[in-house]
Amino acid sequence: MGKINVGRLILGGIVAGIAIDLLDYFVDGVWLAPRWASGMAMLGRPPAFSQIQIILFNVIGLLTGLVAIWVYAAIRPRFGAGIKTAIYAGLAVWLLTTLFPNVAFMHVAHLFPNHLTLYTTLGGVVEVVFGTVAGASVYKET
């Protein structure tokens, strides 16, 4: 079992994070923007996110990409290199970073309408899995 190539891990994580952030812009910033504005208004919050919030969302996307490629690199010796392993890694990261928090905070706590929770969570699986596959494509052990 080889060591994780830290340089490639960082490169792959950045690629994954950028892909996640770009897809998230289209899912939450364009497609779901009216629903987010409505949901935020129901909470008595401004309908649009601030520039600082958008920057923080992008940082979280980059960190998610780094974690996803770290998981990919960690499970690669057991599952083998390739898209199937990247999908497994992406799904694992999506479960922990998107599905569980969205169900807990958006659905169970009734903070946002169910349709918004469903759409943003399903959009998240596309974002994280696609980002992980993109980042894994540049990861190499040596």
Walk through the language-model features, giving the residues of each:
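Juxtamembrane/disordered regions of integral membrane proteins
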Residues: M1-T142
